[in-house]
Amino acid sequence: MSLTLAIYGKGGIGKSTTSSNLSAALALKGAKVLQIGCDPKHDSTFALTGMLQPTVIDVLTEVDFHHEEVSVEDVVHTGFAGVDTLESGGPPAGSGCGGYVVGETVKLLHEFGLYDKYDVIVFDVLGDVVCGGFSAPLNYADYGVIIACNDFDSIFAANRLCLAIKQKSARYRVELAGIIANRVDYELGGGTTLLEQFAETVGTQIIGRVPYHDLIRRSRLMGKTLFEMEGPGKEECTTPFLEMAEYLLNRPRSTVPKPMGDREIFNVIGGWR
């Protein structure tokens, strides 16, 4: 049975870059990996494939949603380290439901007999939206993973995501594996001090620390994973992903988080340093 991860975080926090490098690290550890982008921008897998690929919804629309006319090759593309990638896409802006799109994607994977072919499936999910639509990947996941950095807005979004995972855990098997600290800067950004206090408060842990480094920015622009890049800082940037991959493949300790109320987090976080 596949290990299924649903990765969330505040919009612009670096989910797609982080997800792609985590998928690459999992593959380099020997896992057969599928990354599913759940965002109408369909750029989740750009770093793995170097291209913007057609979405499931684009392909289904062309055949009037006749699934039997769609082949695996139409929607699944192989990227770096043999990671298979798929972009679910989404409805046009201002219409439709993202949850329906995710459901159609999973349905198609089952029809192809692919869902159980992989050791790991990674859902990279749009922004910090926790509506019934874009929280749908939690229905299929073993673990939720939250990406955050050491600032208020990011932690506020992480707290809301903890609430979504807690609510979903009442009906589904999903629990929170932990938080990936992104853009960690010990000189100007306070390192992970706020994130560590938040993790302890909601009953979870930091499972990886990704540095704030220009190599990561450049890799995203070039449509490459960090493992394909050259230059100063490569080992510093890739090591956290390899360590996280090893940790997740060993089925980590997980919890049902205990989120704070919105007013509570406003009051509490001001006292953290």
Curated annotation (Swiss-Prot):
GO terms for biological process: light-independent bacteriochlorophyll biosynthetic process; photosynthesis, dark reaction. ATP binds at residues 12-17, 41, 182-183. Keywords: 4Fe-4S, ATP-binding, Bacteriochlorophyll biosynthesis, Chlorophyll biosynthesis, Iron, Iron-sulfur, Magnesium, Metal-binding, Nucleotide-binding, Oxidoreductase, Photosynthesis. Its EC number is 1.3.7.7. Pfam families: Fer4_NifH (PF00142). Its cofactor is [4Fe-4S] cluster. It catalyses: chlorophyllide a + oxidized 2[4Fe-4S]-[ferredoxin] + 2 ADP + 2 phosphate = protochlorophyllide a + reduced 2[4Fe-4S]-[ferredoxin] + 2 ATP + 2 H2O. Pathway: Porphyrin-containing compound metabolism; bacteriochlorophyll biosynthesis (light-independent). The keyword Transmembrane helix does not apply. Binds 1 [4Fe-4S] cluster per dimer. Component of the dark-operative protochlorophyllide reductase (DPOR) that uses Mg-ATP and reduced ferredoxin to reduce ring D of protochlorophyllide (Pchlide) to form chlorophyllide a (Chlide). This reaction is light-independent. The L component serves as a unique electron donor to the NB-component of the complex, and binds Mg-ATP. NCBIfam families: DPOR_bchL. Homodimer. Protochlorophyllide reductase is composed of three subunits; BchL, BchN and BchB. Belongs to the NifH/BchL/ChlL family. This is Light-independent protochlorophyllide reductase iron-sulfur ATP-binding protein. The gene is bchL.
